[in-house]
Regions:
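Mid-chain, well-packed structural core segment of small domains
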Residues: 63-102
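Helix-rich interaction surfaces within compact, conserved domain-sized segments
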Residues: 84, 93, 111-119
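Short hydrophobic beta-strand segments
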Residues: 5-8, 30-35, 84-85, 103-104
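Short, well-structured hydrophobic secondary-structure segments
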Residues: 17-63
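Well-ordered alpha/beta subsegment
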Residues: 113-138
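Trafficking entry modules
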Residues: 100, 105-111, 115
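Glycine-rich phosphate-binding "P-loop"
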Residues: 1-13
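A generic structural motif
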Residues: 55-66, 129-137
Length: 138
C-alpha cells in the first residue's frame, strides 16, 4: 500500500523539496517529481542546480531510462515505482503504484483547497496518511 505524507504550512515549496530530496537520495531512493508542465520542470531543475553549494542532487527532466535518481515530469510517467512528490493540484491516476507519495502544501488558500480535496480522496480510499506541519519542524 502507498504511504502518503502531507507537508502543510510550507513557506517555500522549493526549499522543502530540496530538504526532502537530500534525505531520500541518501537512502538511495528513486524519486519522481510531478510538476504542471515543462516550464515548471525547468524551473525546478534550475533550482536544484543552484540551491546548495555543498550538495548536488542528480536529476533529469523526463522519463528516460537514465540512471539519475530524480526524474522531473508532468505526464506522470516514471521509470520507478519507489517515491513520488506531487506538485500538481490534481491526483495522479497512478499514485497507488508508488511505495510513498508526498504532497507539499503551501500557505496559499487555493493550494490548501486543492490539497484538502486530494486528502479527502486518499482518506476515502483508506490510505494511511501522515500530516506534517512544516511550520513546527526544526
Amino acid at each position: 500500500m502507498t504511504y502518503i505524507d502531507f507537508y502543510f504550512n510550507v513557506e517555500n515549496k522549493l526549499n522543502k523539496i530540496h530538504e526532502i530530496l537530500e534525505k531520500e537520495i541518501f537512502r538511495k531512493r528513486k524519486i519522481f517529481i510531478a510538476v504542471n508542465d515543462l516550464n515548471g520542470a525547468e524551473a525546478l531543475s534550475n533550482f536544484l542546480y543552484t540551491a546548495s553549494i555543498t550538495s548536488f542532487l542528480p536529476h533529469m527532466i523526463g522519463h528516460h531510462e537514465e540512471k539519475a535518481p530524480i526524474h522531473i515530469g508532468w505526464d506522470y510517467k516514471s521509470v520507478s515505482d519507489d517515491f513520488m512528490i506531487n506538485l500538481k493540484s490534481d491526483i495522479s491516476p497512478s499514485f497507488s503504484r508508488y511505495l510513498r507519495l508526498i504532497e507539499i502544501v503551501s500557505n496559499n488558500e487555493e493550494d490548501k483547497k486543492t490539497a484538502r480535496d486530494r486528502l479527502k480522496f486518499y482518506r476515502d480510499r483508506g490510505y494511511e496518511i501522515q500530516l506534517i506541519d512544516a511550520s513546527k519542524e526544526i
